[in-house]
């Protein structure tokens, strides 16, 4: 069985999805990672874990149609070459372009992760409004297929996608986050006395 995990940036994969890839590898999958070309140290880390890396020219903020078409062609070529059984797309562009490429190739199980809708859906102004409408249209055209399964991390996003007729409700599930490796982050005893709490997060 072959699995491809597709993300914008390799550092994001290493910080958020590496344990999933290792679990799939240990379960017997041949695991491939596709992302924007990164540092040699990050690629070496994948090699040590016996994960195969494939550079894809993702540009997170690009709106250049030729560049975006090039990215789509690269994904389509990669899927034809590897013939994966499952593709797992994470973040907006991998979800949209990866799903489209996988549907063109044929019988591939498609699992998309929508961890949040991001800043675009709360930003004000006419530019943000237009971009949001275009993104929702793209989601509806590309994701509205019985071949596609979607993971959400909160019910509000699932409801929004359902209201805009983007998804098949029976092809979705809600998970409570990307997960924490408890072998690496071990539970510590609660200190006595008055504690201090630090939140390290991006507030939207």
List where the protein language model places each region:
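Active-site proximal beta-strand in glycosyltransferases
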Residues: 2-4, 103-121, 149-151, 173
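N-terminal strand-loop element at the rim of the active site
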Residues: 6-67, 160, 172-174
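A short, histidine- and acid-enriched strand-loop-helix "catalytic/donor-clamping" loop
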Residues: 8-14, 59-63, 108-129, 140-142, ...
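An amphipathic, basic-hydrophobic alpha-helix
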Residues: 57-86, 96, 100, 104, ...
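Short His-centered aromatic/hydrophobic patch
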Residues: 89-95, 114
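A short, active-site helix/loop in glycosyltransferases that binds the activated sugar's phosphate group
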Residues: 144-172, 180-182
């Amino acid at each position: 069985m072959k699995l491809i995990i597709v993300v914008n940036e390799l550092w994001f994969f290493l910080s958020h999805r590496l344990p999933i890839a290792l679990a799939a590898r240990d379960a017997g999958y041949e695991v491939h990672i596709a992302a924007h070309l990164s540092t040699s140290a990050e690629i070496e880390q994948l090699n040590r874990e016996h994960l195969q890396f494939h550079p894809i020219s993702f540009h997170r903020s690009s709106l250049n149609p030729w560049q975006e078409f090039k990215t789509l062609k690269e994904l389509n070529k990669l899927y034809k070459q590897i013939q994966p059984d499952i593709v797992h797309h994470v973040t907006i562009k991998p979800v949209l372009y990866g799903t489209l490429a996988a549907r063109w190739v044929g019988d591939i199980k498609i699992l998309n992760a929508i961890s949040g809708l991001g800043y675009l859906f709360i930003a004000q102004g006419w530019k943000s409004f237009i971009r949001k409408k275009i993104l929702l249209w793209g989601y509806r055209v590309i994701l509205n297929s019985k071949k596609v399964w979607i993971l959400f991390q909160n019910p509000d996003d699932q409801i929004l996608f359902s209201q805009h007729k983007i998804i098949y409700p029976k092809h979705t599930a809600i998970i409570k986050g990307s997960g924490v490796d408890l072998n690496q982050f071990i539970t510590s005893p609660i200190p006595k006395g008055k504690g201090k709490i630090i939140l390290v997060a991006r507030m939207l």
